[in-house]
Design a protein with these regions (language model features):
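Acidic, Gly/Ser/Thr-rich repeat motifs that build Ca2+-stabilized beta-propeller blades
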Residues: 22-165
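Positively charged n-region of N-terminal signal peptides that target proteins for export
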Residues: 1-6
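Bacterial N-terminal signal peptides
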Residues: 7-19
Length: 165
């Protein structure tokens, strides 16, 4: 693993320098997306394979919202809200705990299934769950359909994993 560290470090530095150079020369410009939305600790934007072109924004504190089609809108529909679950060790936590990933089933358009990866406390553990969309509202998750697929005890609060695909 060590022999890959130097080439990877060089690649990362070159990428950072190239991106900075492009911005300095005016070849690219970063602009805020959805400037009127209140977004807290975003971790993923996921587009379901259902042809709807909806963009789901997963946030670390346990909420998943559907981004509005109008980028200037201040409203985003809440798809899933797990913020009442004890995902983080404390409210002011700025670590990796919380909702860490989301993925849609390849046949989401047919079965409405999606998957989330999150942490839980007491005992501290990583969880991968399957859920389904509400039968009455395609813009809402049905948390009563949650099926825990995997739970792994975590001895520490850092570096549990990342996104799921």
């Amino acid at each position: 693993m060590h022999r890959f560290a130097n080439p990877m470090m060089i690649l990362a530095l070159l990428s950072a320098v190239a991106g900075t150079a492009l911005a300095d020369e005016g070849l690219c410009k970063l602009e805020p997306a959805f400037p009127n939305l209140k977004i807290e600790r975003p971790i993923a934007v996921v587009i379901p394979p259902d042809g709807s072109k909806r963009m789901f924004l997963a946030q670390q504190r346990g909420k998943v919202v559907i981004l509005p089609k109008d980028e200037n809108s201040a409203d985003a529909a809440t798809f899933l809200d797990l913020s009442d679950r004890k995902m983080e060790a404390n409210e002011s936590s700025k670590f990796e705990e919380g909702l860490d990933g989301m993925a849609f089933h390849p046949k989401f358009a047919e079965n409405g299934k999606f998957y989330i990866f999150y942490t839980q406390q007491d005992p501290k553990r990583a969880v991968i769950s399957e859920m389904q969309v509400s039968k009455s509202d395609a813009n809402k998750a049905d948390t009563s359909t949650e099926r825990v697929l995997l739970e792994v005890r975590l001895p520490w609060w850092w570096h549990h994993s990342g996104n799921i695909a």
